[in-house]
Amino acid sequence: MGNSSVLDDVFENFVNSAKQFKDREVLRHDYIPEKLPHREDQIRLLGVTVAPVLRDSRCSNIFIYGKTGTGKTAVTKYVLSHLESKAKEYGAQVKFCYINCRMTGSEYRVFAALSQSVGLSIPFTGLSVGEVFDRFRSGLDQSRIIFIIVLDEVDALIKEHGDAFMYELTRINETLTKSKVAIIGISNDLRLKEFLDPRVFSSLSEEELVFRPYDAGELRNILLERSKLSFQDGVLTDSALSICSALAAAEHGDARRALDLLRVAGEVAERLGAKTITEEHVRQAEKHIEHNRVVEALNNLTLHSKLVLLSVYHLNKPSATTGEIYDIYNELCGEMGSGLLTQRRLGTLVNELDSMGLVNAKVVSMGRYGRTKKIRLEISRSLIRDVFGGDNRFSQLIEYSPQAAHKKVGGTA
């Protein structure tokens, strides 16, 4: 049977099988529903904060904290969408720019995106960061607007490149005469203030808003509302809905995970030709998502977090100390030509890798020698090879044999 015939069968079976979905896009992360259950207080507080722009006044900067999947981005986009409509109604000269800092990846690209949002064309490379910022500032001032900048996952960029770009943005109003800027910073890390210059933090966090995790009951309500829009009537079983809610609640109340579980469970049922989505389909979806989650986490790590993880990989020990990891990390930075972080900063990155489930970092007592942290991989070495081996920057480092690894573990790598 030729490939064309195989595909004909696949497509015809899909079209003729039981239809589970009305609209699967409703279960995607970027879908903003008409209602955001259990976030009414946050919507009101953010709305009150940004409302002054409707009277051509600059609103306060605000920092929004919360773990992944707690509704930070959805609430921000929801509020600003409604604010945009009101601004047009009242004739207020307001403009917004949303930037995901993890996806953007550098200060240059942040300033380039801001420049483009006020009508400037910026080359992909070739200018200094300072030159791009100056062009943005000049173009913005000529626009005569109130400009609200949303920096989502700003913690990722600050940890990778420092907070110099944030310092420039928080002081920009001092040099503008015709426009005004307000900043909404969104962070997954509640400890971000530890990485910020106190002057930057005080300017940025004029207002603060913390999003607590959803509980199982709230997640169930969210999924129930979305399921009415996404699935055909009678397709989703009550047990499948409950297990999705419970699993996501166990993962710090992550609504994104709950939505992913529900969508993938529906797709599993769809491929099997099942008429209903059951708990077993959710269990299969969980396994599939977990693998993809780890791959995505590895791909999205910052440069130095990848180097730290590779250092643990090369040690290949049941448990390693921070000092041993730092020795390997030092070598890998040299091979890549990258700047070196301090051992204390490396310890912070180890803690972040631990919180992501990529390594296990446990403090153990060494008796009269005090306490030390023992670190080991929590994911398979083959998965690290597969993911990092596909990145030109890291493929050679995977095969590299660090001298410190030979010294520490007798030649095992």
Where are these regions (language model features)?
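Mid-core helix/loop region of P-loop NTP-binding domains shared across ATPases and GTPases
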Residues: 3-21, 28, 59, 102-222, ...
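Walker A/P-loop nucleotide-binding motif
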Residues: 57-80
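A short, basic N-terminal segment
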Residues: 1-59, 411-413
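Conserved C-terminal helix/linker of AAA+ ATPases
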Residues: 268-291
